[in-house]
Amino acid sequence: GGYLPRNYINFDQSVAACKKKGAGWHLNQTGVFAYLNLLSQKMSTVPHGNTNYGKDYYHPYERGTMPQGETQRTLTGSGQPTWYHNHDMSGIADINGNLWEWTGGLRLMNGEIQIIPYGNSMKLDCDMSASSTLWKAIKPDGTLVEPGTAGTLKIDRTSASDATLRINTSVTTQTTDSNDTSEVFKNVKAVSGVAIPKLLVALGLFPDSGVTGYGNDRFWARNNGERLPIRGSAFYNTSNSGPSALYLNNPRSYLNDLIGFRSAFVE
């Protein structure tokens, strides 16, 4: 801890930076990020964080450490114990706020939800490129199938005039590069008749019916083109912030001052 998190880095650069550290190191997997969030919900320790330019939006007396001249990011792990996933300094810090984080193993392709399953995105030789054959789509019963298979789960916009995000097995309204679809995460629903497998909950793409601690964390997406996830909100998200916040709007080449990444290690 105690470092200023890196920003201005795109998805592929984040993957490469993690792999450069050697065997076992990888871009934090989207399912692990979602697991930490679900764990904190079950333990009633939903983490606070830097969601309002150095302080927690809902608990403004809680502040992280900012180096001189910095107005956005706080040093990693420099917040209160409540800024850790278990509300204790032994936990994982900053999964809520500070910077949005690229995560591995999940993407949208023209709205179709695709994953690299079985933790394979943690492997040093995993190909997460746009053309990788490792990507799989998901049927409503949780079966993994080849991308483009009929009836797979997709992110859909309700209509041209209604930007509400929903889960569907087809895309009825496609977004453009200048608009999107969104919903407060806890309110995300499937179209009538579309079943939601537990896998979607485990991926942090659908709320767990047993959880009551979800805040106003928001889920944004674009269902045109390839979109890679950033998770956990950032220093400016204020009332839309939270560990369930998810932004599936950006292409893999995108970078700015709001987005960073987290490397993780597995043996």
Question: What do the PLM-derived regions correspond to, one by one?
Answer:
Residues 5-16, 23-24, 28, 109, ...:
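Disulfide-stabilized, aromatic/cysteine-rich ligand-recognition loop
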Residues 1-95, 125:
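Short aromatic-cysteine micro-motif
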Residues 100-101:
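Generic structural signal for well-ordered beta-strand positions
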Residues 115:
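Active-site loop architecture of trypsin-fold serine endopeptidases
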